[in-house]
Amino acid sequence: MPGQGLARGHSRTLIYFPIAHTLADMGALKESVARATLEKVGRAGLARKTAAIDQIWTEIEAAIDALPLSFDRVRLYQDGLPVCGREAEIVIELAQTGSRNHQLLLRLMAQGAVLMGTEEGDLLVQEYQLARQSLTTRAPRAAGVAATRRALSQALLQRRDQFIAQRINETLKSGETGILFLGMLHALERHLHPDVKVIYPLHRSR
């Protein structure tokens, strides 16, 4: 039967899309990120990067359209979306700024998929503060300072992965399919329960 869904029996399926963030996804950091990218790669480099990310989203959209999904049994998990009760409002706001990621979420929600708060708010605040510090201060000259900053960033990423995986473990029900949009640096697979079958429609760049 068409649209039967990917999760059958007592299994749970997670469709995992490693994503690249656009400037529209950056919120208050948008201008700082654009400025830092311009300084690093120039206007031509920024244009190439923007086009490459745009192509990634075109491929993600096409991959989802090709999947045999029953959207009334689909849950959406999103990088950077806190468990807060305002999840839909946040997605709408970012979609209106031009985020293809969040525009896609709205389209899937309109088809019946359920949007899930995915991240722990305090961890996202720490991530934002660390990113802002990195973007607004000069690169540390001392190797030790740079190493400490990298270690903090990596530890925070691991804590976020653990929370996201726990959220999926607890909310994705038997017979359901989850769609996860998560930045390419993340690696939460080892934190997922063994009955969650992970599928990568696009190449997992690891």
Q: Can you describe what each PLM-predicted range is?
A:
Residues 1-206:
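Compositional signal for N-terminal targeting/processing segments
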